[in-house]
Amino acid sequence: MWRPSENKVYLPPTPVSKVVSTDEYVTRTSIYYHASSSRLLAVGHPYFKVQKTNNKQSIPKVSGYQYRVFRVQLPDPNKFGLPDPSLYNPETQRLVWACTGVEVGRGQPLGLGLSGHPLLNKLDDTENAPKYVGAGADNRENVSMDYKQTQLCILGCTPPIGEHWAKGNLCTPNTLAAGDCPPLELVNSYIQDGDMVDIGFGAMDFKTLQTSKSEVPLDVATSICKYPDYLKMAAEAYGDSLFFYLRREQMFVRHMLNRAGTMGEPVPNDLYIKKSSGNLDSSIYAATPSGSMVTSEYQIFNKPYWLQRAQGQNNGICWGNQVFLTVVDTTRSTNLTLCATASTQDSFNNSDFREYIRHVEEYDLQFIFQLCTITLTADVMAYIHGMNPTILEDWNFGITPPATSSLEDTYRFVQSQAIACQKNNAPAKEKEDPYSKFNFWTVDLKERFSSDLDQFPLGRKFLLQAGLRARPRLRPVKRAAPSSSKGTARKRAKTKR
């Protein structure tokens, strides 16, 4: 007897729109431009920002362990003076920039900057403990350390995405009592200029997860350390936040210690044999990180990088006429200690001098941009509208409202006080910047484009690797041959005789 199959039938998933590469609808031209910033400098306090008496920021926090996120603004190529007006048809095409080369210049010497805490929660040296010492009421000590070593460069046309662990919420009706361990939640957010990098203590919100303010050094005790979410950016559908990235990290443990305090989760009794007297010491172990030696042999900066193929679907197209360049360089984190005389005495006294500390940074950004065209067919416009509608709005494309058949009123004496005001009182809505609430280092390159690539260091490197030659400027002029005079010809004739 025939019986139907009892196996489940799996239907194919519903088809979805396919994300295509920008190479399928963007046509690249042979026109390149060089753009560079001026020397970018930053000076501030490496541990915290110094406030004035009126609660205004006097000295900003500038640390070698902060992210530098540059928002580079580019000119609109559709309003750009082109060498060849017949390059594109403005009625059916639009121009966009493609980033093909970048070099991040870093000034200042190599060096390591220390950080620390005058009251760090350090109970014992658990690596070489001389004796079993119990915890007192306050065992905090003055400890300094160097951090994990990081070099990072991320390029995209949207801000980079970071991740960190923060305090989460329990499901109802569960409640969190005082002193209970808070639940953890992985949070994604934009990496902004000035955010702290992972220094070796984890990517987390130290302000809410370490309420003692003595577990980590001063510069991160009330801050959030973020780590780039490479997995999320690599899986992004359109690939706008991550064209490519360069990364180098290294760290080792310098000192081992344990934390003072009441153990919230004591060691189970079946894991050890009890002592004859006394209680167990703290079992919360931690370590101070170190990035070890810095050397010029392992530098990712002050070198050109050429973008041939991006890791995502966006192959370097700068949507919105902007790029976001994220930089981290802890190999130049030296802190400058300054000393000022408060009062002059004949003998040396520590109180006669005031000590200060500063950190300085120096950058130079250079780019090579390629001019590209997009033919605005119906399919391309529909695809771009689904990807980012603001792109078409910037190109002055909008939906035409349908013609209305209703009867409208038109007054003759518009300025008369006998009728109501006929003006539209609602002000025109300005275009809202989607990143206005975030903090970035804005670099305006709208007036710094040049087609003379051979006049700039990165431009000459680009011409060399691309096998191109610069346009000759000085051509040798050939002198015309001197015309023979009649007198000279007669002299030659007499000589022959």
UniProtKB/Swiss-Prot annotation:
Gene Ontology molecular function terms on file: structural molecule activity
Family annotation (InterPro entries): Capsid_L1_Papillomavir, Capsid_L1_sf_Papillomavir, dsDNA_vir_gr_I_capsid
Compartments (UniProt record): Virion; Host nucleus
Spans annotated as Disordered: 473-497
Organism domain of life: Viruses
Residue stretches of biased makeup (Basic residues): 488-497
The keyword Metal-binding belongs to this UniProt entry's keyword annotation: no
Any Gene Ontology biological process: virion attachment to host cell
Pfam families, sorted: Late_protein_L1
Main location: virion
The entry's keywords: Capsid protein, Disulfide bond, Host nucleus, Host-virus interaction, Late protein, T=7 icosahedral capsid protein, Viral attachment to host cell, Viral penetration into host cytoplasm, Virion, Virus endocytosis by host, Virus entry into host cell
GO cellular component, one term: T=7 icosahedral viral capsid
Subunit structure: Self-assembles into homopentamers. The capsid has an icosahedral symmetry and consists of 72 capsomers, with each capsomer being a pentamer of L1. Interacts with the minor capsid protein L2; this interaction is necessary for viral genome encapsidation. Interacts with protein E2; this interaction enhances E2-dependent replication and transcription activation.
Function: Forms an icosahedral capsid with a T=7 symmetry and a 50 nm diameter. The capsid is composed of 72 pentamers linked to each other by disulfide bonds and associated with L2 proteins. Binds to heparan sulfate proteoglycans on cell surface of basal layer keratinocytes to provide initial virion attachment. This binding mediates a conformational change in the virus capsid that facilitates efficient infection. The virion enters the host cell via endocytosis. During virus trafficking, L1 protein dissociates from the viral DNA and the genomic DNA is released to the host nucleus.
Family designation: Belongs to the papillomaviridae L1 protein family.
Protein name, per record: Major capsid protein L1
Gene name in the database record: L1
